[in-house]
Amino acid sequence: MPIITDVYAREVLDSRGNPTVEVEVLTESGAFGRALVPSGASTGEYEAVELRDGDKDRYLGKGVTKAVENVNEKIAPEIVEGEFSVLDQVSIDKMMIQLDGTENKGKLGANAILGVSIAVARAAADLLGQPLYKYLGGFNGKQLPVPMMNIVNGGSHSDAPIAFQEFMILPVGADSFKESLRWGAEIFHNLAKILKKRGLETAVGDEGGFAPKFHGTEDAVDTILEAIKAVGLEPGKDVYLGFDIASSEFYENGVYDYTKFEGPEGAKRTSAEQVDYLEELVNKYPIITIEDGMDENDWDGWKQLTDRLGKKVQLVGDDLFVTNTKKLSEGIEKGIGNSILIKVNQIGTLTETFDAIQMAQKAGYTAVISHRSGETEDTTIADIAVATNAGQIKTGSLSRTDRIAKYNQLLRIEDELYETAEFDGIHSFYNLDK
């Protein structure tokens, strides 16, 4: 029977050693689902609220016992006493949103609500004897995503003196996800060799990328290109580059202040100068995607950037859209960006996540399914990427088990789909003139 009989949450740890929420759901028939909730380092101003305890004597204030209690004492009784079916995802998500009653899920916490939402979906898939991607996407879910691999970390994700938060490689020329993953791994290991030869640090950051002290942004890019060529691959054909600039992290009083991360030698740029700078980089290097190139509140700057580069570069809104259909709808209407980053914990339920993906795809925007810097062994985002035919996934570098877990899940899915599996490579960027 599909009736949910038990919902239970506990406090566990994420990849940074910080507490997070784990939720388990059980049905009458014994079907079971478990979900772990991720957490971000750089967060958008308009994201749903991640409820933390604030008790400085426990986990430095980062405990999540309040969120756990909200699941066990408030959400669980509503679900169990209401005799909800595990197959009724939309009704359960809607009930939790109403129970919270706030615009940003600040009462119960998005980390509490999301844990339940995903655990319910996993239990439903278990009940039906289906893999999660098939339960979520039906027979249409068969496209494996191009991995956006963050192999060099800067900004808030490392101590490297570089403002840009992520430098990514995208192996679009591969014939399969399996081959794209191999290319990425070989580039990653060749990059490590190059860094060691230069006497640079090869310790990895939150998302598994290297965080050496490069001589600025272009030094980082040139070194990555060297690693790509060392594998025998061609930049701009086999492999493209991407940036997550996370510009909201260094935007203040109308100025993009690179000195925050790069020291006194860093530039200070107006919105127009920021657009000019990004265009210079695009003209010089094989860049196919730029995330958060402008601040989340600099909509005029975003419009300038979109008008200038929107036909040839994927312009991804992360802090800009925060997986929120209201924000995305406004962006579509104003012609801002051409892609949305999808982070399940930015909005807090699977239903709202899928609504955002569908809205983007209907408008001709791409949807990039994404991890957070504080991750867990949970692989739900891999299944979401295939279920929605998103075509792109951003889940870190080629190290750290919390990142590799998602890649390994995608390998399993590709194997299971066998001849029906699709990998569209460069054609996943249907929002660009190629």
Swiss-Prot record:
Binds a second Mg(2+) ion via substrate during catalysis. GO terms for molecular function: magnesium ion binding; phosphopyruvate hydratase activity. Its cofactor is Mg(2+). GO terms for cellular component: cell surface; extracellular region; phosphopyruvate hydratase complex. One of its GO terms (biological process) is glycolytic process. InterPro entries: Enolase, Enolase-like_C_sf, Enolase-like_N, Enolase_C, Enolase_CS, Enolase_N. Mg(2+) binds at residues 244, 291, 318. Pfam families: Enolase_C (PF00113), Enolase_N (PF03952). Its EC number is 4.2.1.11. Pathway: Carbohydrate degradation; glycolysis; pyruvate from D-glyceraldehyde 3-phosphate: step 4/5. It catalyses: (2R)-2-phosphoglycerate = phosphoenolpyruvate + H2O. NCBIfam families: eno. HAMAP family: Enolase. Belongs to the enolase family. Catalyzes the reversible conversion of 2-phosphoglycerate (2-PG) into phosphoenolpyruvate (PEP). It is essential for the degradation of carbohydrates via glycolysis. This is Enolase. The lineage of its organism: Bacteria, Bacillati, Bacillota, Bacilli, Bacillales.
